[in-house]
């Protein structure tokens, strides 16, 4: 589940029982991380990208990351996991806690200075996961990130023109709502 709220409840301050009292639109409940990993283990080619949400309290964000990483390690699933974080002040700390790749998500509606290549270099970030509009507004950043050997993902790429841009620029990952179209473009 991706949103900060569900049926008016803030997820970060609600219990799992409260959150799952009403099923999702498809009739399922929101799975636990352990349940999600159990299903993922049935598909060896799958890489699990875990988005550690930024909470209002940085201590809570830290606790969520630690608990998440603990479960991943307990289930011996580290080789199949990458993390996303959107809170730059905790990036270095989290990176020191795991050898798993951690991508910086950027701040969704704020462009500078956090997302500038100089800031990324200063933090030693090697994985980026930015909204497509930021790369498209600054194609020179793509060149710089590539020169700095930074692993790139763009989201959410939904037009053919945008898909062509990211394929031409050899992005490592492209997040889209139209995977069939993207796969067709990849096979050309």
Q: Regions from the language model: what does each represent?
A:
Residues 1-101, 130-133, 146-148:
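Metal-dependent phosphodiesterase/phospholipase catalytic core, i.e.
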């Amino acid at each position: 589940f991706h949103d900060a709220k569900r049926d008016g409840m803030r997820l970060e301050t609600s219990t799992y029982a409260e959150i799952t009292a009403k099923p999702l639109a498809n009739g399922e409940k929101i799975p636990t991380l352990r349940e999600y990993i159990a299903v993922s283990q049935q598909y060896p080619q799958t890489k699990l990208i875990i988005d550690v949400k930024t909470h209002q309290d940085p201590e809570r964000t830290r606790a969520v990351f630690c608990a998440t990483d603990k479960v991943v390690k307990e289930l011996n699933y580290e080789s199949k996991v990458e993390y996303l974080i959107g809170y730059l002040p905790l990036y270095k700390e989290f990176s020191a806690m795991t050898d798993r790749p951690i991508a910086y998500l950027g701040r969704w509606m704020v462009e500078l200075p956090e997302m500038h290549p100089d800031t990324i270099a200063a933090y030693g970030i090697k994985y980026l996961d930015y909204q497509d509009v930021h790369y498209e507004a600054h194609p020179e950043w793509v060149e710089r990130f590539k020169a700095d050997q930074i692993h790139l993902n763009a989201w959410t790429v939904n037009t053919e023109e945008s898909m062509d841009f990211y394929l031409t620029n050899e992005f490592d990952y492209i997040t889209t709502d139209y995977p069939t179209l993207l796969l067709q473009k990849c096979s050309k």
